[in-house]
C-alpha cells in the first residue's frame, strides 16, 4: 500500500481501530483526528502519564479517514475471510479490472522509458528483430513477494468490504452523519463519555482550545420527541461543565425524496446508502440561562 495513506490496524477480536506509526499519528492530527494514546509500560500498566502508541480511534474517525481517502485498513486473516465472503461478483470483477489496468500502466511506463533510452542513443525501435526482442523482454513485470514495481497491492474491493462490515455491525449511521457534519464545520471531535455525551467538540486543536460542545447521540429526527426534563437536565449539565449541550438528527426523508424525484432507488445497504446520498443534518444547542 502506498505510504501516502495512514495504516489503520483492525483486529477481528476487538474491532478497535489502532494507529501504530508515529508519522501516521502526526499526519491524522493535522487532519483534525485526535484519538487516544493507549500504549503503556508492561511493568506499570496502571500508570496514566506518558502514554504512547498505539493511538486508539473512534469508529467514526476510522470510517471518515478511509472514505476521505486518507487511510486504509490493515487487518488480520480472520477479518479478511469475513470481508472476502461479503464481496459480490461485480466487485470481484471490478477488482480484477483495476489490477489489470494498473499493470498496463506499468507496461506503458516501461515502454516510454525504453524509447527514451533508445532515442538518447540515436536509435529507433524498428532496427532489427534482435533489438525488438530485447525491447519486448524488458517490458515484462516481475511480481515478487515484495514487489516494488506495483505498490498498490491492497485491493480496493477488500477495503470496501471491511468498511461495509464495520458500518453494518458497529457503527450507527446517524451518529456518523452528525460526526461528518461537525468535521466539515472544522470541529475537532473526541469521545465524550466523561461529559455525558457521544462526542466532545473543539473549535480547533485541543492543545489550543477548550471543548465548546457536548454532542449527544443522534435522535430520530421525525419520530423521537425531546422531553422537557431532558432539555432542562441537558442544559444544566452543559452549564456545569462549561459547554453547549447539543442534540441533532438526520433528515433522511429529504434525501430519499430527492432521490425519488430523480427516479433513483435509495440503496438498501447502509454503506451504499451513505456513499450514494448525503442527507442533511440538523443540530440544536441548548444552554442554561446565565451560561458563562
Swiss-Prot record:
Q: Quote the catalytic activity from the record.
A: pretRNA = a 3'-half-tRNA molecule with a 5'-OH end + a 5'-half-tRNA molecule with a 2',3'-cyclic phosphate end + an intron with a 2',3'-cyclic phosphate and a 5'-hydroxyl terminus
Q: Which GO CC annotations does the UniProt entry carry?
A: tRNA-intron endonuclease complex
Q: Which GO terms describe its biological process?
A: tRNA-type intron splice site recognition and cleavage
**InterPro entries assigned:** tRNA_endonuc-like_dom_sf (IPR011856), tRNA_intron_Endo_cat-like_sf (IPR036167), tRNA_intron_Endonuc_cat-like (IPR006677), tRNA_splic (IPR006676), tRNA_splic_SEN34 (IPR016690)
List, alphabetically, the Gene3D superfamilies matched.
3.40.1350.10
Pfam families the record matches: tRNA_int_endo
Q: Which family does it belong to?
A: Belongs to the tRNA-intron endonuclease family.
Function statement: Constitutes one of the two catalytic subunit of the tRNA-splicing endonuclease complex, a complex responsible for identification and cleavage of the splice sites in pre-tRNA. It cleaves pre-tRNA at the 5'- and 3'-splice sites to release the intron. The products are an intron and two tRNA half-molecules bearing 2',3'-cyclic phosphate and 5'-OH termini. There are no conserved sequences at the splice sites, but the intron is invariably located at the same site in the gene, placing the splice sites an invariant distance from the constant structural features of the tRNA body.
UniProt subunit comment: Heterotetramer composed of SEN2, SEN15, SEN34 and SEN54. Interacts directly with SEN15.
Q: Report the protein name in the record.
A: tRNA-splicing endonuclease subunit SEN34
Native organism is: Eremothecium gossypii (strain ATCC 10895 / CBS 109.51 / FGSC 9923 / NRRL Y-1056)
